Amino acid sequence: MSKILIFFIILFSALQSYEIKQTPIKFSQKRVELTKQYIRQHYGLKVEDIKITPQIILIHYTAIEGFKKSLARFESETLPNDRPDINKAGSLNVSTHFMVERDGTIHQLMPLNYMGRHVIGLNFNSIGIENVGGEGFVENLTVEQLLANIFLVNYLKKRFETIEYVVGHHEYRCFEDTELWLEKDDGYRTKKFDPGPSFMRDLHANIKGFKKAPCD
């Protein structure tokens, strides 16, 4: 992305105000109990609730082009049978705190202080942002989504002073040798491509005060 375009993105994002639409997925006591079970199984922690202290903002794409289809993947409380890559790791369905449409519309799907299942090893200390797009693992997120993500990470930093990192899903394994990594199953890893290095480079070029993934 050119320096001129980045300048206009910074200028526009400073002036832009966003509404966060409340679009809650189903999160009954059943999902809470499944989350506790996941925490015990994968992190070796016995918890009374599923509240988190976020230190990482984890950026994703849905790998599905439509908002309604993307949202539907998170609605069920139990994991569908078409996810053999993660089915063995528990019946808790995936979830995310936010979803951003192609036009930049922002939806909050679940409480920000609840743990969602959206990344191996880092769920217990991260907030997830899913961006609609990336079908076929193509880096095709929009400028509107970039602007919305800039707004969201700054909004979340104001809400949670504990947040330090803004990281792409494809970078999650860079945390394996850090204190933030909690996964106990050495055989539970998947290869991720989202949202891709270009989007993360543009995002970090337009935000300040956040650490990148410790990949070097």
State where each predicted segment sits:
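Sec-dependent N-terminal signal peptides
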Residues: 4-13
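Basic/polar, cationic surfaces and motifs that engage anionic cell-wall
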Residues: 18-33, 135-216
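Macrodomain-like recognition of ADP-ribose-binding/processing modules
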Residues: 18-40, 49, 93-98, 103, ...
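Short, conserved "active-site rim" segments that organize catalytic pockets and cofactor/ligand binding
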Residues: 40-106
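Solvent-exposed, acidic/flexible segments
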Residues: 50-52, 91-92, 119-122, 138-146
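Short coil-to-beta-strand
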Residues: 57, 120-129
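Solvent-exposed loop/turn segments at secondary-structure junctions
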Residues: 63-67, 103-106, 112-117, 133-137, ...
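Short, solvent-exposed loop/turn and secondary-structure capping segments
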Residues: 68-74, 109-111, 121, 178
